[in-house]
Amino acid sequence: MVKIAIFASGSGSNFENIVEHVESGKLENIEVTALYTDHQNAFCIDRAKKHDIPVYINEPKQFDSKAAYEQHLVTLLNEDKVEWIILAGYMRLIGPDLLASFEGKILNIHPSLLPKYKGIDAIGQAYHSGDTITGSTVHYVDSGMDTGEIIEQRKCDIRPDDSKEQLEEKVKKLEYELYPSVIAKIVK
């Protein structure tokens, strides 16, 4: 059984999708040890409780430095014998302590066809750009923002009559298929 921790900052829909894939047996030999969140009021906490997944709430402002924050996370992850970190809407850059402790073992999903539209509101950027195609990317995490090695991408059309909300739903649907598929191939 490979132990993973999932990091999320917001609603946690990708977190819950992964958990449901584990619970249904579609993601085999994986144990979700805990949800790690950096916001005490994040909806992902409710999703974790619904699935009886332990939750660690660690807000960086509780610590003297980013290094102290990450060292605390590394301690918790090591106590749970976590082997992989899966980022699912975690809105912080991963720093050197976590990167060093989990080198090559941190995945992220991003709602664009990287290297286009890194960072926040990637779907909005694609929508307003006039692009006709966008998608989702799973990549390894490095010290940059959405700059790690690309593992796999999935595409969808941006139709002229799509609203931004419709496009967000299309990309979310891609993510729900793509992320568990990549995790199944990579996390061993």
UniProtKB/Swiss-Prot annotation:
One of its GO terms (biological process) is 'de novo' IMP biosynthetic process. N(1)-(5-phospho-beta-D-ribosyl)glycinamide binds at G12, S13, N14. SUPFAM superfamilies: Formyltransferase (SSF53328). Its EC number is 2.1.2.2. Pfam families: Formyl_trans_N. Signal peptide: none annotated. The active site is at H110 (proton donor). One of its GO terms (molecular function) is phosphoribosylglycinamide formyltransferase activity. Catalyzes the transfer of a formyl group from 10-formyltetrahydrofolate to 5-phospho-ribosyl-glycinamide (GAR), producing 5-phospho-ribosyl-N-formylglycinamide (FGAR) and tetrahydrofolate. Belongs to the GART family. This is Phosphoribosylglycinamide formyltransferase. It comes from Staphylococcus aureus (strain COL). The gene is purN.
